[in-house]
Regions:
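Extended, charge-enriched "interface" segments that sit outside catalytic cores
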Residues: 1-23, 123-209
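Conserved phosphate/anionic-ligand binding catalytic regions in large, soluble enzymes, centered on
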Residues: 78-98, 209
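Flexible loop/turn segments at secondary-structure boundaries
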Residues: 86-93, 101-103, 120-121, 132
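Core alpha/beta catalytic barrel or barrel-like domain that forms the active/cofactor pocket
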Residues: 15, 19-31, 77-87
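Extended, Lys/Arg-enriched charged tracts that mediate electrostatic binding to polyanionic substrates
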Residues: 34-79
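Secondary-structure capping and boundary motifs in well-ordered enzyme cores
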Residues: 10, 72-80, 106, 208-209
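Generic, well-ordered alpha-helical scaffold segments in large soluble proteins
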Residues: 48, 52-59, 63-66, 113, ...
Length: 209
């Protein structure tokens, strides 16, 4: 929690932002294109919505556990929708091509967010097999990710020897960047495999970050 001085500084910063908004002129002097509107709408996901999701899920988990006890629970589903680029019945400028652009832009946004997260996690997850050996089954499943998802698994293994988790995450990122994940569920299964591997060595707190 923030102390009194931190709260005071945050309030001061917020007041400064409000003052700046009041003193700022019109950002657009002409009507934006539909493509610009689509990109602008997606910025809300990048800058706030996606970042807030883990806290939403954590609050949900805590609430369920407080009622039903400490048991495995499935997350509730959140599905995002946007009318920008898809309001085919109300905007004559929205053509099939514009809707396709909106879909591709959203797809690329999600891919870039996950790719950035995988890069960050892989840079930090320096667990060594020499210090904490994996069970045979977890070692096999993680290496299956490396073999299937990486374009060059041998060089990946040489670059990060004895760091199976980092290798697997990097392989997943390569697959994501290359567009080789055919189905969302394949990506989810790989993430759950990483999570199961971390749980198997007692690194539950690390898996929850």
């Amino acid at each position: 929690r923030w102390g009194p001085k931190e709260i005071q500084q945050l309030e001061k910063d917020l007041e400064g932002e409000i003052d700046l908004l009041w003193l700022t002129g019109e950002l657009r002097l002409e009507r934006p294109s539909l493509e610009a509107e689509i990109e602008w709408g997606l910025q809300f996901y990048k800058t706030s919505i996606i970042e807030a999701l883990p806290r939403v899920f954590e609050s949900y988990d805590d609430a369920v556990k407080s009622v039903f006890g400490n048991q495995d629970i499935d997350h509730f589903d959140l599905r995002f929708h946007s009318w920008i680029g898809g309001d085919r019945d109300g905007n004559p400028n929205v053509t099939s091509e514009k809707t396709l652009f909106a879909l591709e832009a959203a797809k690329e946004m999600v891919r870039s967010i996950y790719s950035g997260s995988l890069t960050e996690i892989a840079s930090q997850l320096s667990i060594s097999n020499k210090i904490m050996p994996l069970s045979e089954s977890n070692f096999v499943t993680l290496n299956e990710i490396i073999r299937l998802r990486s374009g060059d698994p041998e060089s990946l293994i040489r670059r990060n020897p004895n760091e199976t988790f980092r290798q697997a995450l990097t392989a997943m990122n390569q697959c994501l960047d290359d567009g080789r994940y055919k189905y969302v569920n394949d990506f989810i299964v790989d993430l759950k495999t990483i999570e199961a591997g971390l749980h198997s060595i007692g690194a539950v707190n690390i898996s929850e970050k």
